[in-house]
């Protein structure tokens, strides 16, 4: 009996130690984020004025204002008002993405310093942290977090260690990312299943990027949990019921759901969590259904209860940036890889910039100019 108790005690101690070691492991991104900075001759462009940190209420008009339940009819007046009011947020999203891409490709210190100056200014002013918001406002918050933290990850983890000379700025920026991430979690937690759609998936990507950038495991865990919920929504045929509600835009919104889900899955796998088996392979099933739908949209039209599907969004190659993490997660066919190469390189500022350089660095073409497709 004594020996049995001793053995159990040793086993328990071993398990506890193992758990402690696992808990202490630093969060990491996929290996493409460790790429060194390319160094070239020349000076960086002058640093533009920092966009005014957005510290006001995140209350904006929706571009679908006045639309029916499908939320698919554009209100041009509301969209104009939305774009005007959110201009500083979009400016920093696109600007940081562009500067980080340019820095990683050319290694000019001015681009790095300008990026950090922009992010630090927003961090010091506590931008995007208001608790006064509407649905469109909290949507902008999570999109911005994903864009900024996603781009910052390339600086944080590059083997060239570009942030080593800027510890104070990095500390303030990461502290801000963590605070915004905490608020995004509050914004998008505990929703009824009928209201969980692509917005929640993008929130999961934003929180995942912030969690890895700041090494906050509660953020990582929340993002993984949102993925579990998303995977559970995918039916046996690869459809998302809440995206079918978009009627003529159902296929486009299924496609729009894939970038954040693929990124969360790729980051989870980098940290030893394989989400590809969730709900009997839901992520792969969703991707396969979307790819089939692009070629033959009739099943989407039938399930969405609309004669036609709006294919305009799907004519833009950048909408398929999710193919990069997809082909890193799955064994893509030669035909799909060739198609991906023809459509890329992919740049998506909402995913942190140059997705192709992160997931398929060997796929470089003359088309890979800085700023293209973002």
Curated annotation (Swiss-Prot):
Q: How does activity depend on pH?
A: Optimum pH is 8.1-8.4.
- Please tell me where this protein is predominantly located: periplasm
The protein's annotated catalytic reaction(s) are: Eliminative cleavage of alginate to give oligosaccharides with 4-deoxy-alpha-L-erythro-hex-4-enuronosyl groups at their non-reducing ends and beta-D-mannuronate at their reducing end
Q: Which InterPro entries match?
A: Alginate_lyase, Alginate_lyase_dom, Chondroitin_lyas
EC category: lyase
Where in the cell is the protein located? Periplasm
Q: Which Gene Ontology terms describe the biological processes this protein takes part in? A: alginic acid catabolic process
> Which residues hold substrate?
62-63, 135-136, 253
Report which superkingdom the organism of origin falls in.
Answer: Bacteria
Residues spanning the signal sequence: 1-23
UniProt record similarity statement: Belongs to the polysaccharide lyase 5 family.
Q: Which organism is it from?
A: Azotobacter vinelandii
Upper lineage is: Bacteria, Pseudomonadati, Pseudomonadota, Gammaproteobacteria, Pseudomonadales
Which UniProt keywords are given for this protein, alphabetically ordered?
Lyase, Periplasm, Signal
- Protein role: Catalyzes the depolymerization of alginate by cleaving the beta-1,4 glycosidic bond between two adjacent sugar residues via a beta-elimination mechanism. Splits ManA-ManA and ManA-GulA bonds, but not GulA-ManA or GulA-GulA bonds. Also cleaves acetylated residues. May serve to degrade mislocalized alginate that is trapped in the periplasmic space.
Give GO terms: molecular function aspect only.
poly(beta-D-mannuronate) lyase activity
Q: What is its EC number?
A: 4.2.2.3
UniProt keyword Lyase, yes or no: yes
CC annotations in GO: periplasmic space
Name the UniProt record assigns to this protein: Alginate lyase
Q: Which Gene3D superfamilies match?
A: Chondroitin AC/alginate lyase (1.50.10.100)
